[in-house]
């Protein structure tokens, strides 16, 4: 076309400028591909041309290596061997930044000719620079507007490169036809790159992923709507030297309004070999939510076989959406899952439901759902949750080994309404539970609260700083339906006493706080009133129908601070010594005539020494005449606030035996001393808590209780952790608890059972062996039951533009006996797999792998990939 016009042209030489004089911003010294361009001043103006003409990526005679090099140059790929992906894409706006302010166009070339109609024919290093747009080519036909002050349209040919710095778009093509007024253009054969916003995770940082999609098309067209239409092309996230995978298509449409890419009639290729036909494919080109099919998932479950899931996402509105997922199980049939989420100005929540229309194995319909919502208006907050499941085995059959669901014995059904400000904390709670396993005894089923009303008041802000007056009010109606009376097969139905409890606790506290220490005495008087509704079928009988309890609690908390600052070559530090005394007096009161509604006994730990009551809940208040004496020491880095070392050690001296226990009514407590064999000791164990940064990246923590009278350690928990800058993790944890009160069920407490010991060890690691290979593993062993409780091993291979992960897990679930939640069952296998195309998501269920990795102490979501 250019050759045919030459005979009508008037020859001229030089450069036409529509802008101010060229400025220093056009100097190429900062251009990452400066080896291909050379700029110098000619007649007071900048002139840029390639120092050495590169090879054309469209040259059919190029070798594979030469073509990759040419493409890398054209797409502004800058080599950086230290990066895992080998480099990065340059995206420099230095040539057009000034033009955005002046709103002018910079046109330059080596030779030009005008025809009779004012059309400019330019040749030789033609450059058109506008705000946020760069055009480079060998030749151009340029149509100017009526006063020659701007370009109306142009046709450019020969080594054409189009750049848009703001979006990162770069196009390398053979020819370009552009309308500068409406921003439309079309090209011939073209290579391109598009920016893709990625999550900030380890394998998606700038060293491990380019952050771009690139591709090829026979034609590349940008329409007036801004949409991009490609024909006979492909897309991939690999750099110009990486062709590991591609998604090809006869038609590829990129909708810039919905930010979606649509591929029709294509293939998924690995190393240019088609491996899967794709009739239709859609995916967002940014991180915003879009309607469409998501990647299929593969699930394995020992009870249901293999499941293949096909999810579809509906982006219904900015504030609500819907996910539908069909799963075809090889042994069960089809299950339909749905998740609806919504958000308004004052409320947000979601509905999750699943339905098995017909289970092939069970021959019936099955399902479950969870409805949850929260709300907030100024100082008012609400919370609602309701769970339902059709049968006790549903979670075990369809949860793919999710331990939180497989071991679930109770369904939450709760509504909360609270109002809080600086002086008032009030609320209404309605709480009930659904029982998953009907073998759960009535004693082990928690009480419903129908309802519970609280009102807490404080004088903060009204009284002097040294004085605080407060009152706590909690009124609850406890209710429980009938259930199995015991764990024997065919046990009769039994009940537990229902009751109303009123709890009032006024308190006066003095706060004498100084920079060097504190003295804080307080007096609290809990008043409890119970109205019991006894029944002959109650498993535990109580003689009285009403009970009143009044107990004063006197407490003094005192301590001092001794600080010392010092500086060394590593920074400035503060060492603090904190001796502390904590005295409590509570008179004894027989409370066996009060049922246990929400009360249990805690394990002895260091921080428990500074609590006035060793029982949780409100149904037991221990008698006390005891003094805690302790000393705490710590060293803190003043530069970053980190604690290098912390040591705490203390003991309690008892001036009276502990007489209050968990016996209630006529329950089996033949020898209450068996429950607490140390109730007559004069001293508690020596309790300690330690945390040390052993060296860089290595941390050690320990909690140890040493009982002097028996000369043994009856509580010990150790944790050794390592995590470095490369996110390598290694943990060893060991715990040995001689009397684990936390493991006792309510029925075991009623029977006067002695707390059982607990001893376990856990090893876990995430090890990035190389930039490519990584492993994750966890091993947990239960010494008391002499078996593995949980073990998994995962393997990841991370390539430049894709990653693959596989994980195997073997778990002994604690769902064998709902009345013995510590009993381990047989080991069950679960397998998980994910294949991820960087920039386009993955195939597989990332939540399954992620939930396992999060069991490793120190692991953070994203360190193994997007959502992992």
Swiss-Prot record:
Keywords: Cell outer membrane, Membrane, Signal. Component of the lipopolysaccharide transport and assembly complex. Interacts with LptE and LptA. This is LPS-assembly protein LptD. Belongs to the LptD family. Pfam families: LptD, LptD_N. Transmembrane segments: none annotated. The lineage of its organism: Bacteria, Pseudomonadati, Pseudomonadota, Gammaproteobacteria, Thiotrichales. Residues 1-24 form the signal peptide. It is found in: Cell outer membrane. Together with LptE, is involved in the assembly of lipopolysaccharide (LPS) at the surface of the outer membrane. The keyword Signal applies. It comes from Francisella tularensis subsp. tularensis (strain SCHU S4 / Schu 4). GO terms for cellular component: cell outer membrane; transporter complex. One of its GO terms (biological process) is Gram-negative-bacterium-type cell outer membrane assembly. The keyword Repressor does not apply.
């Amino acid at each position: 076309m250019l050759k045919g016009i030459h005979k009508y042209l008037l020859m001229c030489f030089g450069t036409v400028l529509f802008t101010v004089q060229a400025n220093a911003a056009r100097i190429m010294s900062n251009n990452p591909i400066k080896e291909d361009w050379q700029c110098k001043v000619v007649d007071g103006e900048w002139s840029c041309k390639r120092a050495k003409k590169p090879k054309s990526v469209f040259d059919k005679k190029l070798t594979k290596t030469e073509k990759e090099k040419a493409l890398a140059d054209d797409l502004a790929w800058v080599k950086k061997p230290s990066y895992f992906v080998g480099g990065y894409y340059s995206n420099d706006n230095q040539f057009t930044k000034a033009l955005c302010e002046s709103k002018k166009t910079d046109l330059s070339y080596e030779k030009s000719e005008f025809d009779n109609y004012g059309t400019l024919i330019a040749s030789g290093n033609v450059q058109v620079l506008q705000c946020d747009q760069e055009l480079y080519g060998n030749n151009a036909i340029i149509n100017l507007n009526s006063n020659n002050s701007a370009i109306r349209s142009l046709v450019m040919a020969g080594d054409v490169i189009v750049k848009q710095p703001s979006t990162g778009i770069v196009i390398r093509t053979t020819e370009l036809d552009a309308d500068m007024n409406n921003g439309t253009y079309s090209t011939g054969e073209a290579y391109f790159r598009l920016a893709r916003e990625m999550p900030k995770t380890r394998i998606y940082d700038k060293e491990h992923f380019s952050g771009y999609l690139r591709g090829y098309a026979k034609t590349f067209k940008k329409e007036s709507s801004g949409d991009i239409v490609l024909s006979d092309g492909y897309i991939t996230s690999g750099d110009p030297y990486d062709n590991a995978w591609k998604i090809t298509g006869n038609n590829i449409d990129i909708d810039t309004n919905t930010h979606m890419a649509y591929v029709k009639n294509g293939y998924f290729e690995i190393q240019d070999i088609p491996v899967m036909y794709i009739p239709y494919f859609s995916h967002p080109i940014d991180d915003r939510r879009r309607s469409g099919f998501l990647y299929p998932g593969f699930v394995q479950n020992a009870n249901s076989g293999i499941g293949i899931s096909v999810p579809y996402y509906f982006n219904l509105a900015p504030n609500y959406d819907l996910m539908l997922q069909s799963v075809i199980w090889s042994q069960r049939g089809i299950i339909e899952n749905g998740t609806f989420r919504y958000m308004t100005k004052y409320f947000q929540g979601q509905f999750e439901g699943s339905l098995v229309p017909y289970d092939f194995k069970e021959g019936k319909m099955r399902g479950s759902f969870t409805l949850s919502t929260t709300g907030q208006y100024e100082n008012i907050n609400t919370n609602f949750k309701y769970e339902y499941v059709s049968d006790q085995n549903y979670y075990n059959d369809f949860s793919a080994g999710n331990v939180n669901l497989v071991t679930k014995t109770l369904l939450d059904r709760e509504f909360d309404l609270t109002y809080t400000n600086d002086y008032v904390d009030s609320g209404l709670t309605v709480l009930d539970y659904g029982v998953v396993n009907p073998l759960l005894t009535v004693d082990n089923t928690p009480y419903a609260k129908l309802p519970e009303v609280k009102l807490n008041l404080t004088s903060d802000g009204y009284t002097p700083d040294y004085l605080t007056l407060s009152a706590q009010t909690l009124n609850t109606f406890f209710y429980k339906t009938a259930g199995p009376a015991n764990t024997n097969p065919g046990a009769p139905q039994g009940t537990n006493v229902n009751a109303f409890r009123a709890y009032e606790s006024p308190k006066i506290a003095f706060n004498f706080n100084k920079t060097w220490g504190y003295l804080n005495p307080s007096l609290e008087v809990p008043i409890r009133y119970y109205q019991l509704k006894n029944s002959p079928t109650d498993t535990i009988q109580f003689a009285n129908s009403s009970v009143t309890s009044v107990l004063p609690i006197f407490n003094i908390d005192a301590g001092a601070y001794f600080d010392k600052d010092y500086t060394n070559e590593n920074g400035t530090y503060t060492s603090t010594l904190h001796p502390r005394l904590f005295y409590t007096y509570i008179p004894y009161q027989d409370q066996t005539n009060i049922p246990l509604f929400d009360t249990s006994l805690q394990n002895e730990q260091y921080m428990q020494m500074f609590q006035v009551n060793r029982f949780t809940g409100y149904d037991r208040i221990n008698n006390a005449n005891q003094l805690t004496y302790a000393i705490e020491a710590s060293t803190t880095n003043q530069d970053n606030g980190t604690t290098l070392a912390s040591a705490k050690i203390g003991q309690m001296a008892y001036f009276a035996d502990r007489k209050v226990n968990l016996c209630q009514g006529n329950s089996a407590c033949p020898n209450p001393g068996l429950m607490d064999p140390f109730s007559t000791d004069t001293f508690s164990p020596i309790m300690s808590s330690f945390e040390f940064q052993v060296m860089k990246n290595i941390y050690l923590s320990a909690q140890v209780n040493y009982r002097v009278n028996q000369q043994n350690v009856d509580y010990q928990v150790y944790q050794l952790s390592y995590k470095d800058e490369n996110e390598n993790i290694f943990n060893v944890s060991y715990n040995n608890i001689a009397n684990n009160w936390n493991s006792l069920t309510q029925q075991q407490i009623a029977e006067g059972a002695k707390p059982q010991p607990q001893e376990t060890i856990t090893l876990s690691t995430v090890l990035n062996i190389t930039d490519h290979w990584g492993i994750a593993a966890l091993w947990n062993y239960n010494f008391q039951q002499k078996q593995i409780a949980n073990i998994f091993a995962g393997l990841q291979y991370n390539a430049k533009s894709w990653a693959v992960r596989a994980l195997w897990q073997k778990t002994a679930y604690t769902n064998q006996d709902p009345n013995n939640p510590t009993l381990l069952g047989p080991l069950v296998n679960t397998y998980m797999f994910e294949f991820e195309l960087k920039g386009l998501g993955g195939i597989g269920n990332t939540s399954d792998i992620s939930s396992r990795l999060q069991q490793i102490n120190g692991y953070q979501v994203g360190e193994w990939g997007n959502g992992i």
